[in-house]
Amino acid sequence: QDKPFWPPPIYIM
């Protein structure tokens, strides 16, 4: 079960 991330990860550190 893969749930779409929302809000989407814009900044990734």
Curated annotation (Swiss-Prot):
Keyword tags: Amphibian defense peptide, Pyrrolidone carboxylic acid, Secreted
BP GO terms, sorted: defense response
Pyrrolidone carboxylic acid sites (modified residues): Q1
Compartments reported by the entry: Secreted
UniProt keyword S-adenosyl-L-methionine present: no
Tissue and organ expression note: Expressed by the skin glands.
Any one annotated GO CC term: extracellular region
One Pfam family it belongs to: Tryp_FSAP
UniProt keyword Ion transport, yes or no: no
Family membership noted in the UniProt record: Belongs to the frog skin active peptide (FSAP) family. Tryptophillin subfamily.
The protein, known as: Tryptophyllin-T3-1
Organism: Pithecopus azureus (Orange-legged monkey tree frog)
Lineage: Eukaryota, Metazoa, Chordata, Craniata, Vertebrata
